[in-house]
Amino acid sequence: MEDEQSRMKKKKQERRAPVTHTDSKMSIISLGKPEPVLTTGTDYQEIWYDNDFDHYSQPIDRLALAQLVNLNGQHGGVLYARRNMVAADYVRGGLSHEELKAGVFDYLTFGDVAIAKVRNGWGDVVALAPLPSLYLRVRKDDSIVILQKGEPLVYSQEDVVYLKQYDPQQQVYGLPDYIGGIHAALLNSEATIFRRRYYHNGAHTGGIIYTNDPNLSTEVEDEIIKSLEQSKGIGNFSTLFVNIPKGDPEGIKFIPIGDISAKDEFANIKNISAQDILTAHRYPAGLAGIIPSNSAGLGDPEKARATYRKDEVIPLQRMIMDAINSDPQIPAHLHVKFDIEDTQSGAL
């Protein structure tokens, strides 16, 4: 009788025996490398003379400054608004409206701009043209170099009018006046991109796929690993069908690593960083499309515009006129003229 019960028990255990794994070691897989959101490239560097390329290095990477314009809505929007306000009063001169807007935008974005004097065969100045500041470099003899494929374009000091914003640490290149707000612009953009990727990825920031079902065969495990490794990029956690006969419903789990819904500072980051950007540009919030958070509002936008025009726009317009019109080689018909005597604006 005992032998019969022993055989019955052994047979029952054999029926319940789980699938054994040939490889019992722990498995860890990666679902893709971390993707960088933004690279700063905007740290201030000491300039030095590059003898190989025969020009001074730049204090801040200009490609990073150019990319930042399109990465952040507040920063880029304010730059375009500042450019438009300067160009709105342009009357006439050796620059077309489009050329003036390009030169002003480069001056605001990179901190300097070079206006080339276009000469005829007799050496007379017959036109003016802004040079792209993104590719502008300066040599020891103060000549201006414009990088391009092949040999660079070189303009002697007397062939350009070089306007630059003051930098107390060096006097070779100009420095944008919004430098103090760069990190706020980066933070604002990174917060938005992080939120977009969070929802693209299934409302989680990644996690651990944990399996503890003894009925999960090695073949099924390999198929799961293969499917996960083949899914890359944003939203790499897609629907996956797994069939484990007599499996445990809790045998496969996805454990999120982080959850931003518990303490979401997205709104605070966006609001504070946006205010920092406007402060760096000294630009009125009422002109930037900022929605007021209090019942008092942002004041009269016409008064804000008049004050901003008086303190920021007109001084820049006068500087451009003085730099170009005071050059003895530039004839009077090429002198630039801004209508800065607009009494209706209330700026003067």
Model-derived regions, located:
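Extended, charged amphipathic alpha-helical segments
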Residues: 2-12, 151-298, 303, 307-348
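Flexible, gly/proline-biased loop segments at the beginnings
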Residues: 1-135, 260, 297, 305, ...
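Active-site and NAD+-binding cores of ADP-ribose-processing enzymes
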Residues: 36-40, 46-48, 121-174
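Short, charged N-terminal helix-start/capping segments
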Residues: 23-52, 138-146, 189-210, 241-243, ...
